[in-house]
Amino acid sequence: MELEILLPFPSAETMTESWAFSEAQIDFRHDPEAGARCTISYAAVELRTHLLQMEPDAQICFVSQRHNGKAAIELHADSLTASGDAYALLPQKDGLLIRGAGRVGVLYGVYEFLKMQGWRWLEPGTAGEYAPEPGCGLLWPKNAVHDASASTLGRGF
């Protein structure tokens, strides 16, 4: 299986893993764009890590531009400065668009997609992680999935 994870940032091919773990260098309140890049990159790394556990022989790469004909999961935030946690999983011709209202929505959308694959997290760390059997293939949603917090304050504190 070949899959592209499309991020909305130039240089995603080489910088995604670095951005994903740069939270200690970012002031999320004063530099929300850098915060969004960090969170969305972390979501991409989580997605690739978990999908590779399901499909160890897969070739999954990060890209900033989609290549025609390749399956792709596109990560998109409606706003890089908003803190919205709503998300949508939108089936596309050759993949999936995970669209969040903000950076947190993208992360929640990635975890929802992984839950569809059979992943469960019963407690923090790998000890509380339930993984689907390797080689079972990807399950693509047939219909759009939408979710938004019922609270205007978000899902938690």
Give the positions of each predicted feature:
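Feature activates predominantly on carbohydrate-active enzymes
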Residues: 34, 40-46, 50, 82-84, ...
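Acidic, contiguous N-terminal accessory segments
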Residues: 1-91, 136-146
